[in-house]
């Protein structure tokens, strides 16, 4: 009976659509989370006491905002941000609204990941660039970000996997994807096979993200032939 029900879902492309929607929401959210989180992380590093342009006031305010959003459990934050989604999109339902709430939940997390990666760059590298007369922008763009690239890529893997887990939570807010399939067609209908298939598919997606991210990271950390 369970197998027949699962095959019916498969034949109706419900499982396949859930995979696509999960991947779509994960990567679109990751993209915009980094559009917001990357500059925010750079500013946090720059204004830190050991940064290029220390500014305690700016760093304290931004740090408080980031920590405030990071301290709220993801599902509660997503519920709280529904009005913001409605303000931006005119609706509080659907994947568009869910993606907005996901971005707001993920961006502060990304900002801290970026800041942590930038702090791993040796101070001597920055000092050498300053001694050569580079401007702060040149140091950030041509020295800091390239030096931190392997760590940034590693952090992006963790961030993307975390955002993937958020998409499953989004099913409770009306979002689609494998989370919705697991809840509606699995849990609510006592179809454990459907739930476990969704779990396995999410695991596969995570592994693919990890493999791709690790491969890209190795390309930047492996010594060149000239070395």
Segment roles from a protein language model:
Residues 1-17:
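Short, strongly hydrophobic alpha-helical membrane anchors
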Residues 220-225:
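Conserved small/polar residues in nucleotide/adenosyl-binding loops
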């Amino acid at each position: 009976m369970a197998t027949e029900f699962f095959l019916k879902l498969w034949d109706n492309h419900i499982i396949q659509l859930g995979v696509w929607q999960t991947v779509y929401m994960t990567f679109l959210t990751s993209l915009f989370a980094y559009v917001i989180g990357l500059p925010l992380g750079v500013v946090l590093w720059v204004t830190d006491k050991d940064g290029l342009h220390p500014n305690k006031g700016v760093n304290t305010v931004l740090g408080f905002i980031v920590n405030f959003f990071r301290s709220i459990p993801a599902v509660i934050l997503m519920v709280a941000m529904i009005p913001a989604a409605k303000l931006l999109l005119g609706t509080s339902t659907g994947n568009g609204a869910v993606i907005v709430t996901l971005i707001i939940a993920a961006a502060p997390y990304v900002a801290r990941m970026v800041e942590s990666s930038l702090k791993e760059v040796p101070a001597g590298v920055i000092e050498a660039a300053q001694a050569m007369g580079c401007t702060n922008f040149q140091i950030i763009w041509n020295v800091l970000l390239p030096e931190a690239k392997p760590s940034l890529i590693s952090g992006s893997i963790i961030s993307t996997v975390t955002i993937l887990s958020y998409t499953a939570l989004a099913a409770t807010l009306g979002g689609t994807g494998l989370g919705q399939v697991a809840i509606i067609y699995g849990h609510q209908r006592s179809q454990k096979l459907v739930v476990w298939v969704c779990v396995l598919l999410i695991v596969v997606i995570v592994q693919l993200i990890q493999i791709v991210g690790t491969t890209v990271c190795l390309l930047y950390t492996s010594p060149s032939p000239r070395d």
